[in-house]
UniProtKB/Swiss-Prot annotation:
GO terms for molecular function: RNA binding; rRNA (guanosine-2'-O-)-methyltransferase activity. Specifically methylates the ribose of guanosine 2251 in 23S rRNA. The lineage of its organism: Bacteria, Pseudomonadati, Pseudomonadota, Gammaproteobacteria, Moraxellales. Pfam families: SpoU_methylase, SpoU_sub_bind. It catalyses: guanosine(2251) in 23S rRNA + S-adenosyl-L-methionine = 2'-O-methylguanosine(2251) in 23S rRNA + S-adenosyl-L-homocysteine + H(+). SMART domains: SpoU_sub_bind. Its EC number is 2.1.1.185. Its main location: cytoplasm. Belongs to the class IV-like SAM-binding methyltransferase superfamily. RNA methyltransferase TrmH family. RlmB subfamily. It is found in: Cytoplasm. One of its GO terms (cellular component) is cytosol. It comes from the Bacteria. S-adenosyl-L-methionine binds at residues 200, 220, 229. The gene is rlmB. This is 23S rRNA (guanosine-2'-O-)-methyltransferase RlmB.
């Protein structure tokens, strides 16, 4: 049996119990804690016969790997890792998929924030390269506040090759967010159909090999003197504009 993963934080554990309770092996709660938020978690766990163990603050910190566990940690059966084949399956019967691809975003806090926004916007999947990218660590899951259980997270071997593949086989329009001579203001782009919005890390932007797969680049107009936004903030603004258009 694979080693369990550990989820921590009230929102993350609540969402897991609501959506995938069968994955929860054991709940660890802080000794002496007895409040409404914890009671809700215990009520969600009870119908499934999930083992609940009281633990010290130090024990919870060791399980979570961080002190910011909010008094609850869940030992969880690992989720299967999704890959290129899962992305193909997702797109086979979908001609209105909206995807978010992150090019070497390495900060788990940024990844978690992007996933949270993607889940709120109803995005079909978040795609990242397997190497040199943040993965779904407990920190990313906590920041996602339940979003990681609501949106598909797909890791691919080569992001540029994957973008080329879904363009050729599923007619996905690849839109890069960067300011170059061909970039359109984001509100001028037509986000209908299958679309992948590609975001780069805020310090390095999109790699040239990723840029080469973009059918169009867009930028977010700003009136201030800032040259760039945090990637999770920019992702939220881009996804909002795409969803605004698609909802009519």
């Amino acid at each position: 049996m694979a080693k369990p993963e550990y989820y921590y934080g009230v929102h993350s554990v609540e969402s897991l119990l609501e959506l995938e309770p069968e994955r929860v092996l054991t709940l660890f709660t802080l000794k002496g804690r007895d409040d409404q938020r914890l009671q809700k978690i215990l009520e969600l766990a009870e119908p499934f016969g999930i083992s609940v163990q009281k633990a010290s603050r130090d024990s919870l910190e060791k399980l979570a790997g961080l002190p910011f566990h909010q008094g609850v940690v869940a030992a969880v059966r690992p989720h299967p890792v999704l890959n290129e084949k899962d992305l193909d399956q997702l797109l086979q019967n979908n001609d209105q998929a909206l995807l978010l691809a992150l090019d070497q975003v390495t900060d788990p806090h940024n990844l978690g924030a992007c996933i949270r926004t993607a889940a709120a916007m109803g995005i079909a999947a978040v795609i990242v390269p397997r190497d040199r990218s943040a993965s779904l660590t407990p920190t990313a899951r906590k920041v996602a506040a339940g979003g990681a259980e609501k949106v598909k997270f797909i890791q691919v071997t080569n992001l540029a090759r994957t973008l080329a593949h879904i363009k050729a086989h599923f007619f996905v329009k690849v839109v890069g967010t960067m300011l170059d001579e061909k970039a359109l203001p984001i509100q001028k782009y037509d986000f209908s159909g299958n679309v992948a919005i590609v975001m780069g890390a805020e310090d390095t932007g999109l790699r040239p090999i990723t840029q080469s797969q973009c059918d169009q680049t867009v930028y977010i107009p700003m009136s201030g003197n800032l040259q760039s936004l945090n990637v999770s903030v920019a992702a939220g603004m881009a996804l909002y504009e795409a969803c605004r258009q698609r909802l009519g």
